[in-house]
Structures are given as structure tokens and as C-alpha cells.
Amino acid sequence: MDYKSGLIPDGNAMENLEKQLICPICLEMFTKPVVILPCQHNLCRKCANDIFQAANPYWTNRGGSVSMSGGRFRCPSCRHEVIMDRHGVYGLQRNLLVENIIDIYKQECSSRPLQKGSHPMCKEHEDEKINIYCLTCEVPTCSLCKVFGAHQACEVAPLQSIFQGQKTELSNCISMLVAGNDRVQTIISQLEDSCRVTKENSHQVKEELSHKFDALYAILDEKKSELLQRITQEQEEKLDFIEALILQYREQLEKSTKLVETAIQSLDEPGGATFLLSAKPLIKSIVEASKGCQLGKTEQGFENMDYFTLNLEHIAEALRAIDFGTDEEEEFTEEEEEEDQEEGVSTEGHQ
């Protein structure tokens, strides 16, 4: 039994393995040396250097003017930001395991027979492999198409030369796109910062506005309490005066009532001598009591409190006119009015 053959992966496994060994930049199998990023993704060192240089165009090393500061770029697979020191990509660790796997894979592929159909065949000449590139039509084709077929009058070139050129062009495009993605990510970060700062500034001005209105509420409440206190004081003074008058009139009423009772009792006295003895003083007291009825009175409208009314329409209008940026406009308007008044005074003086 061939135990070794059982260790060799089948075709599908080899294809899956090959996909894992493809560089996301050049889209080819990793070229040694292979470097591993902090995010655990792998790149050819050359490809890593290409995107690093594209993202940091002013950073040079290995023969150029050495920049003492590092740079950064983003992993093309996961967009994780990779921060470099002054050594650049040469400071990244090599992935020797991946390099060994590549060697084993290549050795296994070289020992396997070439599968039928692994090389693209010409559609016009099914037995011919595609081995040249038509520069005129910009399509790959076979030699028979150039000699006998549709591309006789076209300019062609070896497939390998065009292959290498377009690979290089595609790699450059990828590097340019990755650098562009980094710039877009930078813009996104700046816009996110703008959102954050906008929210912070909005919160700050809201707080300031709330404090200013709270101060206005406090002034209004203080003024309201002051004016209500003045009304209450006036009310108490008037009530004290009225209650004092009521007390005086009640005392007078009580005296008059007693005199009336005494006078009625005197009228019931049957004896003339007895009646005459008390009648004269009683009449005198009644006359004096009648004169005492001329006590103080309240003036007409004494109860009126209308003089405490307020006209707050102009203040209400000023409150309704509150808006952002009106302070400078009002100051400018007041300055204009003062200038107009000064001009009017100077004109009258000349006349």
C-alpha cells in the first residue's frame, strides 16, 4: 500500500490551499519574503512596501534619506491600521511557516501531471493553447489565429510580456486604490470628528441659552415678588385704616345705644322731680353724642387699586423679538439713531 499517496491532498484541496496563498495586492501566490501584519494577515514584502509607500509618499528608506519617524497604512484584507516604526515594512516579522507551505505546495504541483484543461484553449482552434496577445484587439489568442485566423492583420506580442505588464499595472492600481481608500477613511474620520464637535458645541450653546433664560426667569420672579409685596403692603395699610374706622364707629354705636336705653328709661319715670333731675344731663349727653358721629370716612375710590396696573406690552414685544445675533444689530441701530440725532442738532445750530 502506498501510504505516501494518502498524504497528498486531492485537486480541490490543492485549489483551496492555493487560494489561501494568494496575496491580496498582486493577486498572485506570495513572493518571498512573506511578512505577517499585526492583524495576522500576510503580504508579500514588496506589495506591503508598495502600499506603504503609496500611503506615505514622503517616507524613504534603504538608500534614500532616512525618515526617523514611521508611517502607517491599512491592511487590504481587514482595513486594520498598521503602524510602522522607522524601519518601515522591513521591521515586520517574516512568516516562515507560510513560506515553507509555499515551497511544499510548489514542489507538490511540480510533481503532479498537468491536468487537462488547466491551460486556456483557443475557442477557434480547440487543440491550440492561448499563447499570444493581440495588441490591436486587446485579447489573448493562439498562434493559428495570427497565421490563418481573424488576427492575421493584427499586431501581436508574447503572452508573458503582456501578462507581466498588466500584472504590474493591476498591482499599481490596487496600491493606488488602497491609498485612495486610506484617504477616504481619513475623510470619514474627520467627518466623524466634525459630528462629535458639532454635538458638543450644540450642547454647549444649549446650556448657555438655558442659563440665560433661567437668569431672565429669576429676574422676572424677583420683580414679581417685589411688586406683589408692594400691593400687599398697600392693601394692609388700607385695611388697617378701614378696620380702625369700623372700631371707632362700633364704639360710637355702643355709646349711642346705651344713651337711647337710658333715655327710654327716663321717659318711663312717673315722677316729675326725678325726671327733671336726670333729663338735663341726659339731653346734653345725647347732643354731644350726636356731634361725635362726625367721624372720619374713606374717600371716594379709596378701595381702588388700579394704579398698580402695569403696561408690559413693550417688554412682551422685546421678549418676542429675542433671536440669535440680534445684540449687534440693536447696538448698530442705536448708534445710527444717536448719529441721526447729533446731525439734527448740528443742523438746527447752523440755522
Curated annotation (Swiss-Prot):
Its EC number is 2.3.2.27. SUPFAM superfamilies: B-box zinc-binding domain, RING/U-box. SMART domains: BBOX (SM00336), RING (SM00184). Zn(2+) binds at residues 122, 125, 145, 151. Residues 326-351 are annotated as: Disordered. Residues 326-345 have a biased composition (Acidic residues). Its main location: cytoplasm. GO terms for cellular component: contractile muscle fiber; Cul4-RING E3 ubiquitin ligase complex; cytoplasm; M band; nucleus; ubiquitin ligase complex; Z disc. InterPro entries: COS_domain, E3_ligase_FN3/SPRY, TRIM63_RING-HC, Znf-RING_euk, Znf_B-box, Znf_RING, Znf_RING/FYVE/PHD, Znf_RING_CS. It comes from the Eukaryota. Muscle specific. Selectively expressed in heart and skeletal muscle. A zinc finger (B box-type) spans 117-159. Keywords: Coiled coil, Cytoplasm, Metal-binding, Muscle protein, Nucleus, Transferase, Ubl conjugation pathway, Zinc, Zinc-finger. Residues 189-269 form a coiled coil. Homodimer. Homooligomer and heterooligomer. Interacts with SUMO2, titin/TTN and GMEB1. Interacts with TRIM54 and probably with TRIM55 and TNNI3. Forms a ternary complex with RACK1 and PRKCE. Interacts with CKM. E3 ubiquitin ligase. Mediates the ubiquitination and subsequent proteasomal degradation of CKM, GMEB1 and HIBADH. Regulates the proteasomal degradation of muscle proteins under amino acid starvation, where muscle protein is catabolized to provide other organs with amino acids. Inhibits de novo skeletal muscle protein synthesis under amino acid starvation. Regulates proteasomal degradation of cardiac troponin I/TNNI3 and probably of other sarcomeric-associated proteins. May play a role in striated muscle atrophy and hypertrophy by regulating an anti-hypertrophic PKC-mediated signaling pathway. This is E3 ubiquitin-protein ligase TRIM63. It comes from Rattus norvegicus (Rat). The lineage of its organism: Eukaryota, Metazoa, Chordata, Craniata, Vertebrata.
